[in-house]
Amino acid sequence: MNEINLKPVQHAVFDAYGTLFDVHSAASRHQSRLGEKAQAVSALWRTKQLEYTWLRSLMKRYVDFWQVTQDALDYALDSNGIDDHSLRRDLLNAYHELACYPEVPETLRNLKEL
């Protein structure tokens, strides 16, 4: 049987949003203000964020990810009948400080030790 000699891992690359960072944590922070629509807003926000990224790429109408994030939130809020500019601002600010998933710190420490 052939022995496989693997080199030590020197670099690892991750998709940050949705893999390391919980994209729904922004809406969770403002659950009290979003009320029963919190989950729907968060899910639609993420769905539109991905769809807008794909569509703009296909149409070669590139904008930065932050613009996509804002446009997607606007759609999600409007679709849920929410017209609150301060809530919009606070949700976008929360997106700058997304929580990581609980297992991420330990996993990254373990990978660092490899």
Predicted regions and their residues:
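A metal-dependent, Asp-based hydrolase signature
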Residues: R33, Q39, T53-R89
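A structural signal for alpha-helical segments
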Residues: I4, K60-D64, A99
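Short, acidic loop-to-helix structural element flanking the phosphoryl-transfer center
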Residues: W66-Q67, H85-L114
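A broad detector of the eukaryotic-type serine/threonine protein kinase catalytic domain
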Residues: L50-W54, H96
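Residues in soluble alpha-helical coiled-coils and helical-bundle/repeat scaffolds
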Residues: D22, E36, I82, H96-A99
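Active-site neighborhood of HAD-like aspartate-dependent phosphohydrolases
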Residues: N2-L50
